[in-house]
Amino acid sequence: MKPCFQINSKKLEKELLFRDEEDYIYGVNTLALILLQFPGVVVYAFTLMSNHIHLLLGGPREQCEAYYDAVMHRLSLWLKRKYGLSGVVPYGPENREVVVVKGVDHFVIEVLYLLRNPFKAKICYPGDYPWSSVGMYFSRRGQWVGRKASTFTARELRRMLKTNVRIPGHWEIAENGRSFLTL
């Protein structure tokens, strides 16, 4: 088993990372797009909450932390572009919590911790929360089916994913532009 780390952003007190569906879709897509820059990192689980994120990552610690910082940096650019907010998304060592996962039992506990966040916050049951990886493990497959990226034109992908990054053709993309991480 690769070294694993649960990395959380600190909760924003006055602003939100995600205000609407478009923001959440952008966040999920960011997790996938930034992963292309870090081939040594694996995303095992994630939960995007309105004011913070949780990631369970595998790989060398430095790469996992760099991946997290790149995700947060891209989200900060999004908030600046969409809402005119600067400096809202703090990233870097002092603005994240890193838990070293020690063994398989601890790994399972961390996955459950991440996926229970929406329930703990009294939003909904974990299986009903669309902005986490829970559906990758425990869903009715039909709700997660998208089209292969290779079936979209480059222009359609740019519009939906808000990036010029070349997307692997096997990635699944929903009609609303949400990509699906292959976990």
Q: Model-derived features: where do they sit?
A:
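Short Pro-Cys-Gly-centered "Cys-loop" motif that presents a nucleophilic cysteine in a tight turn
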Residues: 1-45, 49-50, 58-183
